[in-house]
Curated annotation (Swiss-Prot):
Name of the protein this chain belongs to: Rho guanine nucleotide exchange factor scd1
Basic and acidic residues bias: start-end ranges: 617-633
GO BP term, example: intracellular signal transduction
Species per Swiss-Prot/TrEMBL record: Schizosaccharomyces pombe (strain 972 / ATCC 24843)
Modified residues (Phosphoserine): 583
Residue stretches making up the PB1 domain: 772-859
Family matches, as SMART domains: PB1, PH, RhoGEF
Function: Required for mating and morphogenesis. May contain a cryptic binding site for cdc42 that is enhanced by binding Ras. Interacts directly with scd2. Promotes the exchange of cdc42-bound GDP by GTP. Involved in septation and stimulates the elongation of conjugation tubes.
Gene Ontology, cellular component aspect: Cdc42 GTPase complex; cell cortex of cell tip; cell cortex of growing cell tip; cell division site; cell tip; cleavage furrow; cortical dynamic polarity patch; cytoplasm
């Protein structure tokens, strides 16, 4: 009989957020006098006793089947069941309804026996009482008031003649409600009256058949299933009985807490939420299961049961979502719960019972999968069973998704409170939080633990400021609420810049490598996830996000990208950066959300809008707001162009690039992944994305350049003014306006040079006074932007020397070690070109953009952006 012993639930059936210390009840203690009532119920009975009690007390179907047989043995009541049976067939009221399937339904018939009222009056008249009740068998459920009047007289006489208390009776109003709880109480009343009848009638009492031996009542359903070799069905049935017993015990425990006022009503509701709804649903499910088991094997349709009740499984969503909160409330109120420790020990027995619904909803897919594997060939309802399997998988996924959304909402609230400096960003522009976790992140052979949050539009990496180590969560008497440490924003990458996501088994079984477009090449970092479930979740979410970014229509992208013109900043956004120090070495290069990449000129904004991602500058620089004509900075409008081949670019013109120098932090450049390494890793996994990574990105996505959108509806260029230029070492102030290159007749942009003249209107042209001897160079070193004014005929060696001197003078690099620099510019096709000679310098200067420096006298200077890579 080892099969009947309690078996531990497999950990595979539990979601990752469940505390595994509360999966199962602990074993029996040596001193049996200290056992709680629940443990006595489970441990101090033989296996055969447990199964017998489960089948004849927990099973609503078997109880009603036995009661119907005993009631029909009373001659005065037998005639009533014909009309009750007809009423059950014709009425819309049923305990469970299957389309096109008819079952013997003793539960509905006994429920009608109570609702009609007159059958109970007839049962009362069979007892040795002085006063009889009127029995009107012609009424139906349509005459509800007449039925209630009969029930009232029945209740009154039971109290007066039989001395029954309210605890032994049921509520008249509740018996007409759809809940099964009043029916369970009504069954107790009927059983009590039948017992009195059998005691008073000695002849019938001696011949009354036992519920366990009657030939017409299926005895030992579980034993029959095991004997026939249907062990999976037997496990489903046995565990369902035990599960409902646990739910009923929890429900009674909750009532005792209310009666004794151990906890407040709100706290009790917060712990148990909709436990009674789950209990009611599971009773109906068990009725449907036993209806099926009462049929021959070839006619049983378990798949139809799950299909019919798919919608009803939604009751689990609320309970499973609230479970972490319930766990914490149990911990916080353990001292009060110890007052009823004789019923349930609060530190381990109560949490172990409270987790049962979550375990059960995760167990159904496993059981049905085993049923499908053991289904004999030729079973006529096999396809229906597969559909039932699909239903229960959907239910489990929906429960998990609801729980995930709830956790994500809480995570966003917690994230907003914990981050000490948002650097001017606002959570409201990040989109929906898709997934988050605390994982180890590897880049450039450095591994650190980060809080990683993947939103629809950005990936954030945050680091805990506290040096305290996280302690494993456990349920104990002395456990206190965990203090939330502050988080520091360390890395941020636009999801539109992510190009490839692949597993990396060289770094671990559950490692994911994410490639993104950096400056000047593709870069990557590795997330070391903790288990297979997390690995599958992150891969699935990232792949869906990549597909959405690549296949989303421009209309959808623009719609998703639209953001309010005046953002509402976080409470911490006003805090300014303190500058770079040795502790600020970022594992991931931080990205400015208000500095995006080139965008196609075919998409334009008719009006100028303030960027929602303008960051607050440091205290040494004046705060300024970047004004552009972009619909949004988060969504890449030219995702195909940015990484496409030259053939794709032949039909598209590249926008002129100007820079936005707003920045709040500076970071030492990380080691850049080589393209050959990327291709090698992708080839290992047969990932067909080489066309996206074998060519370096045609624009910087790390916040070093932005696009100018021309208003094609007007030939008048919007004037753009820049802040006065100095040669000091301050980070450049954000520009407010800038002239852009000329426009072709088809609306595309022309590459601008120092000889390009700018028209102020479509009919008149005015030449600006330009400085033809000097060139202003904007040096891009990651998020730092420096300004250098040089002669137009400067040589390559002189330019390198001036750039190195500028970097040393500004003190950007704290390490006093020798270094070299490499300069690059962006050509007309958007490609990065390395400067290696004097000719390259002249070619770079040919891409200059004229910027108006003095709007009063219409004076300006040619400006070029050069990207700096530092080598140590």
């Amino acid at each position: 009989m080892a099969y009947f012993q309690d078996r531990k639930t497999s950990s595979r059936s539990l979601p990752s957020y469940i505390n595994h210390s509360t999966q199962n009840l602990v074993g029996p203690r040596k001193d049996e006098t200290n056992l709680s009532e629940y443990m006595k119920l489970r441990l101090l009975q033989s296996p055969s006793q447990v199964i017998y009690n489960l089948e004849n007390t927990v099973s609503l179907y078997r109880r009603c089947l036995n009661l119907r047989k005993r009631l029909m043995d009373i001659s005065e009541l037998a005639a009533f069941f014909d009309s009750i049976h007809r009423e059950a067939l014709n009425s819309s009221f049923k305990i469970l309804e299957f389309k096109d399937i008819e079952f013997d339904d003793p539960v509905t018939e006994i429920w009608l026996f109570c609702r009609l009222g007159y059958p109970l009056c007839a049962l009362f008249n069979c007892l040795p009482v002085k006063q009889k009740l009127e029995v009107n068998s012609s009424v139906s459920l349509e005459n509800t008031n007449v039925c209630k009047a009969s029930l009232y007289r029945f209740m009154l006489m039971c109290k007066n003649e039989l001395g029954l208390t309210d605890a032994a009776l049921f509520s008249i109003s509740e018996i007409y409600k759809p809940s099964t709880a009043p029916l369970v109480r009504a069954l107790q009343t009927i059983e009590l009256l039948l017992k009195k009848y059998e005691v008073s009638n000695t002849t019938k009492s001696s011949s009354t058949p036992s519920p366990s031996t009657d030939d017409n009542v299926p005895t030992g359903t579980l034993n029959s299933l095991i004997a026939s070799g249907r062990r999976v069905t037997a496990e489903l049935y046995e565990t369902e009985l035990k599960y409902i017993q646990d739910l009923e015990y929890l429900s009674n425990y909750m009532v005792i807490l209310q009666q004794k006022q151990i906890l407040s009503q709100d706290t009790i509701l917060s712990i148990f939420t909709n436990l009674n709804e789950i209990l009611d649903f599971q009773r109906r499910f068990l009725v449907g299961l036993e209806m099926n088991l009462s049929l021959p094997v070839e006619e049983q349709r378990l798949g139809a049961l799950f299909i019919a009740l798919e919608e009803g499984f939604s009751v689990y969503q609320v309970f499973c979502t609230n479970f972490p909160n319930a766990q914490q409330l149990i911990i916080d109120n353990q001292n009060q719960l110890l007052k009823v420790a004789n019923l349930l020990e609060p530190s381990y027995e109560l949490p172990a019972l409270l987790i049962k619904p979550i375990q059960r909803i995760c167990k159904y897919p496993l059981l049905l999968n085993q049923l499908l594997k053991g289904t004999p060939s030729g079973y006529q309802y096999e396809e229906e069973l597969k559909q039932g399997m699909a239903c229960v998988v959907r239910v489990a996924n929906q429960v998990n998704e609801t729980r995930r959304i709830h956790e994500n909402r809480n995570a966003i609230i917690e994230l907003e409170q914990r981050v000490i400096d948002w650097k001017g960003y606002s959570l409201q522009y990040f989109g929906q939080l898709l997934v988050w976790d605390v994982v180890n992140v590897c880049k450039a052979d450095i591994e650190r633990e980060y809080h990683v949050y993947l939103f629809e539009k950005i990936l954030l990496c945050c680091k805990e400021m506290s040096t305290l180590k996280r302690q494993a969560r456990s349920i104990s008497m002395n456990k206190k609420t965990k203090r939330l440490d502050s988080l520091q924003l360390k890395g941020r990458i636009l999801t539109s810049n992510i190009t490839t996501v692949v597993p990396n088994h060289h770094m671990g079984s559950y490692a994911i490598q994410i490639f993104w477009r950096g400056d000047p090449q593709h870069e990557s970092f590795i997330l070391k996830l903790r288990n297979e479930e997390s690995h599958k979740l992150w891969m699935s979410v990232l792949n869906r996000l990549l597909w959405k970014n690549e296949h989303g229509s421009p209309k959808d992208i623009r719609s998703a990208a639209s953001t309010p013109a005046n953002p509402v900043y976080n409470r911490s956004s006003s805090q300014t950066s303190k500058g770079y120090n040795s502790s600020d070495y970022d594992l991931l290069r931080t990205h400015s959300l208000d500095e995006n990449v080139n965008s196609p000129t075919s998409i334009s904004s008719p009006s100028s809008k303030s960027s929602p991602f303008t960051k607050t500058t440091s205290k040494d620089t004046k705060s300024a707001t970047t004004t552009d004509e972009r619909p949004s900075d988060f969504i890449r409008l030219n995702s195909e162009e940015s990484v496409g081949t030259s053939s794709l670019r032949t039909s598209q013109t590249t926008s002129t690039i100007v820079s936005n120098d707003s920045s709040s932090t500076a970071s030492i450049p990380s080691q850049i992944s080589r393209i050959s390494q990327v291709n090698s890793l992708l080839n290992d996994y047969n990932y067909n994305r080489q066309s996206h990574i074998t060519r370096v990105y045609s624009g910087t996505d790390d916040g070093s350049s932005v696009s100018i959108f021309e208003d094609t509806s007007s030939s008048t260029k919007q004037k753009i003014f820049d802040q006065p230029t100095t040669n000091d070492c301050d980070v450049m102030r954000p520009r407010q306006y800038s002239y852009s290159a000329g426009m072709k007749s088809d609306g595309s942009l022309l590459p601008s040079t120092k000889h390009t003249s700018l028209s102020s209107s479509s009919t008149s042209t005015s030449l600006s006074v330009r400085n033809t001897t000097n060139v202003k160079i904007r040096l891009r070193l990651h998020e730092v932007s420096l300004v250098l004014v040089v002669a137009h005929d400067i040589t390559f060696d002189e330019l390198l020397a001036k750039v190195e001197h500028k970097i040393k003078l500004c003190g950007i690099l704290k390490q006093a070690v020798p270094f070299r620099v490499r300069l690059k510019y962006v050509d007309e096709d958007g490609d990065f070109i390395t400067i290696t000679s004097d000719e390259d310098v002249l070619m770079a200067f040919e891409t200059c953009t004229f910027e108006l420096m003095d709007p009063v006298h219409n004076k300006g200077m040619d400006t070029v952006s050069l990207h700096v890579v530092v080598y140590f």
